[in-house]
Swiss-Prot record:
Entry's localization field: Plastid, Chloroplast
Record protein name field: Maturase K
One of the GO BP terms on file: mRNA processing
Keyword field: Chloroplast, mRNA processing, Plastid, RNA-binding, tRNA processing
Role according to the record: Usually encoded in the trnK tRNA gene intron. Probably assists in splicing its own and other chloroplast group II introns.
Keyword Glycoprotein annotated: no
Gene: matK
GO molecular function per UniProt: RNA binding
The family this protein is said to belong to: Belongs to the intron maturase 2 family. MatK subfamily.
Main location: plastid
Domain of life: Eukaryota
InterPro entries given in the database record: Domain_X, Maturase_MatK, Maturase_MatK_N
HAMAP family the record matches: MatK
């Protein structure tokens, strides 16, 4: 945000209402370039395309309007020299610059809304790991959980309409519509998952912004009723961005609920309801009954379809009992189990045996999906047997080792909260042996001979920082160090999920 505030010496009206001129500013694409180089990628930093530059983008946008492409049909795009073989490259450049521009007013207003509030180290709340201590504390007292697949908008115009409530610059919105129309023929995007996925992969930053703004729109209303009913002040509600007709929509929904759905208003009065969203899924957990959870399910379906024009089905919401169900959450397999304990009590000549069952929030790493991700990345086969990476054979030995070590440490860092470390040991073994096979293949040697020549140096490279510190404090692998390493550790510096840890 310091970069935004340093570059943008504009008054409030220009910041909020006239974003379009920023498209032709040099520093916008410098910011997009820096974001591409400095973003947190847990695998490998692929860098930025050398063909991308602010000058090319400016000439491109100018040519778009000079050639009057607004009247050119999508069917003629194949003959259009502007939309030739570099169509994907142009699309990437425009989307990155536009994403930076539309994020600026949101980021500035979010920072200003947090100023003056007593939020200690609010940047730690950005970490993915910050949600797990919350789950450990809350889910032990709940009974049911709903796994919800958030529906995609049936048309990209819905995303633009949602953005219209927040961004008041008509020129920027017209450019966004034109961009979708020219590059993706959005008339055909009636929820085909393939088309949406292609769009999101090519223009990930822009798509995530539009999608999150759409989800935040319905969540703001959903959480508004939830917070009003429980009379609890939500810290995050102060950071909600103003939107046109927001309170009119709230008033309309209240009238609908009061007049037509009086029987379901008590849904909002459950004080033990917790909602968590991540990626394209969300979790709704409650201490209520199965009847209550089913009413929530059908309410959400109608809420999405009637007020936000997204197609959803009750089958996309799965209700399970926490005591006998494990749910996939951000690369972890989470469950609430019973930890039995027996207490012997003696009173005079009589003795009693008391069985106590204490709930425990268990988090483990699902080994099968993770091995599948490693197999897809060519580190092993589908059975988990390590294989060499021919693509790395042309690199230097130190570069090969550094790449494998970085991936191994990032996976260990992300999965440090696992209750059982056995799965991590197996993943480290696969990566370590895959590295050895790659080096042996490069030197035309056997793995045994190469490891014998290298000694224990390769093994030490794969030790994480935690293991290195513990080995210095507690030498000879004492029971204390083993007990500390087996414990769950959550970090507040993880702001993106590892691609290998994402089993979607």
């Amino acid at each position: 945000m310091e970069e935004f505030q340093g570059y943008l010496e504009l008054d409030k009206s220009r910041q909020h209402d006239f974003l379009y001129p920023l498209i032709f500013q040099e520093y916008i694409y410098a910011l997009a370039h820096d974001h591409g180089l400095n973003r947190s990628i847990l695998l490998e930093n692929v860098g930025y395309d050398n063909k991308s530059s602010s000058l090319i983008v400016k000439r491109l946008i100018t040519r778009m309007y000079q050639q009057n492409h607004l009247i050119i049909s999508v069917n003629d795009s194949n003959q259009n020299p502007f939309l030739g073989h570099n169509k994907n490259l142009y699309s990437q450049m425009i989307s990155e610059g536009f994403a930076v521009i539309v994020e600026i007013p949101f980021s500035l207003r979010s920072v200003s809304s947090l100023e003056g509030k007593e939020i200690v180290q609010s940047h730690n709340l950005r970490s993915i790991h910050s949600i797990f201590p919350f789950l450990e504390d809350k889910f032990l007292h709940l009974n049911y959980v709903s796994d919800i697949l958030i529906p995609h908008p049936i048309h990209l115009e819905i995303l633009v309409q949602t953005l219209r409530y927040w961004v008041k610059d008509a020129s920027s919105l017209h450019l966004l519509r034109f961009f979708f129309y020219e590059y993706y023929n959005w008339n055909s995007l009636i929820t085909p998952k393939k088309s949406i996925s292609i769009f999101s992969k090519r223009n990930q930053r822009l798509f995530l912004f539009l999608y999150n703004s759409h989800v935040c729109e319905y969540e703001s209303i959903f959480l508004f009723f939830r917070n009003q009913s429980s009379y609890l002040r939500s810290t995050s509600s102060g950071a909600l961005l103003e939107r046109i007709y927001f309170y009119g929509k709230i008033k309309h929904l209240v009238e609908v609920f009061v007049n037509d759905f009086q029987a379901i208003l008590w849904l909002f009065k459950d004080p033990f309801m917790h909602y968590v969203r991540y990626q394209g899924k969300s979790i709704l957990a409650s201490k209520g009954t199965p009847l209550l959870m089913n009413k929530w399910k059908y309410y959400l379906v109608n809420f999405w379809q009637c007020h936000f024009y997204v197609w959803s089905q009750p089958g996309r919401i799965y209700i399970n009992q926490l005591s006998n169900h494990s749910f996939d959450f951000l690369g972890y397999l989470s469950s609430v189990g019973l930890n039995p304990s027996v207490v012997r009590s003696q009173m005079l000549e009589n003795s009693f045996i008391i069985d106590n069952a204490i709930k425990k929030f268990d988090i483990i790493v699902p080994i099968i999906p993770l091995i599948g991700s490693l197999a897809k990345a060519k580190f092993c086969n589908v059975l988990g047997h390590p294989i060499s990476k021919p693509a790395r054979a042309d690199s230097s030995d130190s570069d090969i080792i550094d790449r494998f070590v970085r991936i191994c440490r990032n996976l260990s860092h992300y999965h440090s909260g696992s209750s059982k470390k056995k799965s991590l040991y197996r993943i480290k073994y696969i990566l370590r042996l895959s590295c050895a096979r790659t080096l042996a293949r490069k030197h035309k040697s056997t793995v045994r001979a190469f490891l014998k020549r290298l000694g224990s140096g390769l093994l030490e490279e794969f030790l994480t920082e935690e293991e290195q510190v513990l080995s210095l404090i507690f030498p000879k692998a004492s029971s204390t160090s083993r007990r500390l390493y087996r414990g769950r550790i959550w970090y507040f510096d993880i702001i993106s999920i590892n691609d290998l840890a994402n089993h979607e």
